[in-house]
Amino acid sequence: SAVKVMHIPKDNSEINDLHRSGMDFDSIHTYFEDMVKNLLNEIQIMESLKSASNIVVIEDYQIIPRNKEIGWDIYIRMELLQDLGTFLEDHGMTRQQVLRLGMDMCQALTACEQEHIIHRDIKIDNIFFNGFHSFKLGDFGISKQLEKTQSALSQKGTNMYMAPEVFRAEKYDHTVDIYSLGIMLYRLL
């Protein structure tokens, strides 16, 4: 296992900067509290996908509010993985590994689709390698649950891998993730 430790805000300078920009204490508190809520949403999405073998597994987490000051300390215990970027720097990838990556990500996206989740940011930085020749999808920070959306969905993601309908802020569905995966696999070949 690995433990990811996060502090929201990272330090008091973030609070001071917001205060200098004219925000009052309550607004600053709400601003950072929303960050924590977004992180909790990402954790809950990943927990809903826990049974999927190609999704990064969060084993446990704890969010601890700080006493008498604005801030939260967040501890996330997850499986120990290597990010794909580091894997590529250390090893490169054969065609067979790129195919394996593609198949693993298709399984991950199938699990997302079954839970009505659009990842919206399929890219090298959000894929991990477990050391057993298996790749896993992580970082659901900008994913969107379909049932929570109405007509037009917001533009999120990385432009290099973004489907045209997302870029144009048109209505889209889970197929935008398949498009992004295809672009990424093409670049890896």
Where are these regions (language model features)?
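Short beta-strand micro-motifs within the conserved protein kinase catalytic domain, predominantly
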Residues: 57-72
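Activation segment signature within eukaryotic-like protein kinase domains
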Residues: 101-102
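Conserved catalytic-loop aspartate of Hanks-type protein kinases
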Residues: 177
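Conserved short submotifs of the Hanks-type protein kinase catalytic core
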Residues: 69-83
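Protein kinase catalytic-loop region centered on the HRD/HxD motif
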Residues: 107-117
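Conserved activation segment of eukaryotic-like protein kinases, specifically the C-terminal portion
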Residues: 152-165
